[in-house]
């Protein structure tokens, strides 16, 4: 009987606590109950779903290394999801968890939000919508934080994500102006926030074709980011920008930084950094034997099997430049046989084979390749 009485007392105490945790009461117990519940249950699950979706997007994104890479990866801007359709189910789950946290744990009393986790929920809401390509709805969430949570720890991130969203909505000049204003508050930004803002400024300037300005900010982003995947990507983009303005030596210096990261950054950046350096090779003054050894090492490295198509294409270009056409033909065909995912590269292989045959007056064979 005593045990039953004790159990009953415990239940009564728990019920009293739960009743006391009203969303309409501005009490310490209520605030902390709803903050903890939002943080360690709903928001935690939402963040997990968001990270899974973003990681899957980054992993599955097919970069076009023939053009300047985008700062961040999103699905094609030409793809518009149908109503109720999500780019990735993980982003839909993240959005649902954010909405649930806001609906169940918001404690707006006398016009003031008392639950310190609700701004986190709005950030998650905006990010999930952003990656789901619903940019206007994402903008609503970031604007809500900026309007109603001026003392939030997420203010800098909300401003950065708002600018990112403005860029996606083709309001690039507005985004650039707001990011410059944010960077003027440098003392208020932590290192990663500064890196993120600088990266998006670089993206804005690339869209505006102001490559000199983009170079300034991609350098800051590459130096400051704590994420090695981003560091490798940003230094690679910086190399591409220098190549684009004809500064090949400066481009190569940045490709070397990508190569030096080695396993700390995805291998695709390192391989393409080598490839771009090889394209910048001066066949009149450069050490051709050393270049041959580099290409041989790249081809024979088992870890480079996913990249054999581009390595063999570059080997073919080497042979073509040193006048060994038979070897060039063999390597263009090897590149085609590797059957990589880069269809543009395959077209370059066929075009090169067509050109070689055309130059040798083999017009019928050339026509077949064209």
Listing of model-derived features with the role each one plays in the protein:
Residues 20-370:
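Acidic, polar-rich low-complexity tracts and alpha-helical solenoid repeat scaffolds
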Residues 1-9:
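Bacterial N-terminal signal peptides that target proteins for export
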Residues 9-10, 229:
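Sequence-pattern detector for short linear motifs
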Residues 13-21:
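Hydrophobic h-region of N-terminal signal peptides that target proteins for export
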